[in-house]
Amino acid sequence: MTKVGGSDSKNTLYCSFCGKSQHEVRKLIAGPTVFICDECVELCMDIIREENKSSLVKSRDGIPTPREICKVLDDYVIGQPQAKRVLSVAVHNHYKRLNHATKHNDVELAKSNILLIGPTGSGKTLLAQTLARILDVPFTMADATTLTEAGYVGEDVENIILKLLQASDYNVERAQRGIVYIDEIDKISRKSDNPSITRDVSGEGVQQALLKIMEGTVASVPPQGGRKHPQQEFLQVDTTNILFICGGAFAGLEKIISTRGKTTSIGFAASVQAPDDRRTGEIFRKVEPEDLLKFGLIPEFVGRLPVIATLEDLDEEALKKILTEPKNALVKQYQRLFEMENTELTFQDEALNVVAKKAIERKTGARGLRSIMESILLDTMFDLPGLDSVEQVVIGPDVVEGKSRPLYIYAERNEKSGTSA
């Protein structure tokens, strides 16, 4: 235990690891001869988590097992068990295919690119970001909305492979074993069912440009980013063993799926179609390739994405877990902000239920949670820096619904302040 001279500090306890006093931390845990603060405990847990991530259980071939990959995804992403299983198996098979290519020449194992379909805020991008943390192969994420056909303002599709090269420190051999996630893939859908006489340079044109690199070709990649340096030497990258995962919200696809096979009629004898009350994620489970064609993807592009995984709408329980359970959960973030004002922020359990219900009503998934939390805490965060001795702020369900103000608990007088709206 760290000792500091002076009569005022004789009874003050200090963390034996970081040296902070009991007044500078939330908790100080006592051992036989030492003390450790909550911040050092959290730091130790982070170190252990990192060690666990880097030591995934290996199967007989030295490959991470699908179950272990899925378990790591569970630590960071709430819900979506089916999508996690699909991704875990795909990554496991990707490793196996790479090992097989170096040992056998009899049967060539083709890759199975993946299409992730799910409502906005359901966790598609977060799943990809989590995969990037735990994989031993190079991984990169690209945004389909920035891509255009070659010769037009925007990024060429070869820039995706350039990002993969950068992720592998320009080691071409490693880059050729990597995984690419292309986000917002639904934004490059064809603008109409019928081919247009004008060029669709950011839609169908991009799909056609992606065909060869997704299937497997030797791409010429400009190491300095392409169009501004026409004299540079190109790197040759074989994309045959690069796994492509595409994700998108596909807004409007649920209507195409719901109306598939239904005949339309008019007049007095027309049959009245009942509205589909199913949630978006539930409808997505019934998706067929023909629905994607109607949405605006070209047949050749759909054919290069043989594995389709759909994500569910997040229900109230899942949204509540997202608020509190992950390492960077929203409630923990705001609690840390309030700690900087020496104030403890507490959410009642029923208040979290109301927040989750509001997010479901907004139909923005987990992304809507931050907006709701900001509106709840705005006035409190505005007033708090100018108030003295506020020890605790309590948020109840009425506060979330806008019926009352947060409850302020003061340290010295132990007074409670909270007025109804």
From Swiss-Prot:
Q: Which Gene3D superfamilies match?
A: 1.10.8.60, ClpX chaperone, C4-type zinc finger domain, P-loop containing nucleotide triphosphate hydrolases
Which InterPro entries does the UniProt entry name for this protein? AAA+_ATPase, ATP-dep_Clp_protease_ClpX, ATPase_AAA_core, Clp_ATPase_C, Clp_protease_ATP-bd_su_ClpX, ClpX_bact, P-loop_NTPase, Znf_CppX_C4
Would you say which domain of life the source belongs to? Bacteria
Q: Where is the signal peptide?
A: none
State the disulfide connectivity. Answer: none
Keyword Cell inner membrane assigned to the entry: answer is no
Keyword Chaperone, does the record have it? Answer: yes
Q: Provide the ClpX-type ZB domain boundaries.
A: 3-56
Its family? Answer: Belongs to the ClpX chaperone family.
Tell me, how does this one assemble? Component of the ClpX-ClpP complex. Forms a hexameric ring that, in the presence of ATP, binds to fourteen ClpP subunits assembled into a disk-like structure with a central cavity, resembling the structure of eukaryotic proteasomes.
What protein is this chain from? ATP-dependent Clp protease ATP-binding subunit ClpX
Q: What is the lineage of its organism?
A: Bacteria, Pseudomonadati, Pseudomonadota, Alphaproteobacteria, Hyphomicrobiales
